A protein has these predicted regions:
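Charged, low-complexity, helix/coiled-coil-prone segments
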Residues: 1-8, 41, 45-51
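Long, compositionally biased
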Residues: 45-71
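Charged/polar, solvent-exposed surface patches and flexible loops
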Residues: 11, 15-18, 29, 39-42, ...
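Amphipathic, hydrophobic secondary-structure cores in small proteins
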Residues: 23-47
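N-terminal acidic leader/helix
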Residues: 1-27
């Protein structure tokens, strides 16, 4: 995986954690378990052009669709 994609995923994890009142570790585990990390890696070309809030919203939807319970 390219460094720029890794950096973007890290930023998104941090933003997700802040928006959902989670630690970074909790956010990573949740996103990993519910395919959010996979989504970001596969859709980097589109997602990185959007705002971070849009990315967090997309992650919330993807994770809910894969069994996640965080609103």
């Amino acid at each position: 995986m390219e460094r720029k994609i890794i950096n973007y995923i890290v930023v998104c994890i941090n933003e997700f954690a802040l928006s959902k009142n989670l630690t970074e570790q909790e956010a990573f585990r949740y996103l990993y378990a519910n395919k959010g990390i996979e989504f970001l890696a596969e859709n980097y070309d589109i997602e990185h052009t959007l705002s971070l809030q849009d990315a967090v919203n997309d992650l919330s939807i993807v994770c809910r669709n894969n069994g996640g319970m965080i609103q």
